[in-house]
Amino acid sequence: MRSGVIAQKVGMTRVFTETGEHIPVTVLKLGNCQVLGHRTSEKNGYTALQLGSGSRKTVYMPKAERGQFAAAKVEPKRKVAEFRVSEDSMIPIGAEIQADHFVVGQFVDVTGTSVGKGFAGGIKRWNFGGLRATHGVSVSHRSIGSTGGRQDPGKTFKNKKMPGHMGVDRITTLNLRVVQLDVERGLILVEGAVPGSKGGWIAVRDAVKKALPADAPKPGKFRLADGGEQAAPAAEQEGV
């Protein structure tokens, strides 16, 4: 199981195929996504990579956080996240993961925070049908109707779908296809919509319900902190 990456949503556009078909895509940008630390089964009970992306000023940063970035010898990061990996997919601390960590045509799962909608009614929030247009109904056409029973149970149960705050939820969209890659600018173009607003942080992982392409680099495609060579695809590593 390979590591994912932390990307930032740029926006949506479209690309054209050789046959003239247009594909709506979301542009995701890798902003200096580096490995900050390792989580091992011996020390932590599980195996994972801690990644950081973006830039952050140290003025209001706690001393403990500054020490973590200093120990990894990387610049302070705006966004930090962990990705579970297998033991053979560990990437050196300080390495920068590049856009060609993924390959064109593979499927990925993206996770982000949905756009906030504020206080919403039952029709917008839960797709309720509302009340009738006529037959004695006035003013309450967009009401949700009854919320409980009668004297028994005599209450509204917890988790009842009602009006309330909508959005700002953690959303994962499965099986988005990678359409194009721009390694120089660190861009990943995936087909379809990605949850979140422009500038929002997105976690991109290999799709769990799709097979990993044979030409996907293992443990990943990255650039070492000392300027060393990048990791080669699995086929090249095995001498195929």
Swiss-Prot record:
Q: Which residues carry this modification: N5-methylglutamine?
A: Q151
Going by the UniProt record, its keywords in alphabetical order are: Methylation, Ribonucleoprotein, Ribosomal protein, RNA-binding, rRNA-binding
Q: Keyword Transferase on this protein?
A: no
Gene Ontology, cellular component aspect: cytosolic large ribosomal subunit
- Compositionally biased tracts (Low complexity): 225-240
Instruction: Report what the Swiss-Prot or TrEMBL entry states about this protein's PTMs.
Output: Methylated by PrmB.
GO BP annotations of the record are: translation
Region forming the signal peptide = none
Name the InterPro entries on file: Ribosomal_uL3 (IPR000597), Ribosomal_uL3_bac/org-type (IPR019927), Ribosomal_uL3_CS (IPR019926), Transl_B-barrel_sf (IPR009000)
The terms under GO molecular function for this entry are: rRNA binding; structural constituent of ribosome
Q: Which Gene3D superfamilies match?
A: 3.30.160.810, Translation factors (2.40.30.10)
**Region feature (Disordered):** 139-164, 215-240
Give a short account of what the protein does.
Answer: One of the primary rRNA binding proteins, it binds directly near the 3'-end of the 23S rRNA, where it nucleates assembly of the 50S subunit.
Under the heading PANTHER family, the entry gives:
50S RIBOSOMAL PROTEIN L3, LARGE RIBOSOMAL SUBUNIT PROTEIN UL3C
Family, per entry: Belongs to the universal ribosomal protein uL3 family.
Q: Describe, as the record does, how this protein assembles with itself and its partners.
A: Part of the 50S ribosomal subunit. Forms a cluster with proteins L14 and L19.
Name the record gives this protein: Large ribosomal subunit protein uL3
- Which species is the source of this protein? Rhodopseudomonas palustris (strain BisA53)
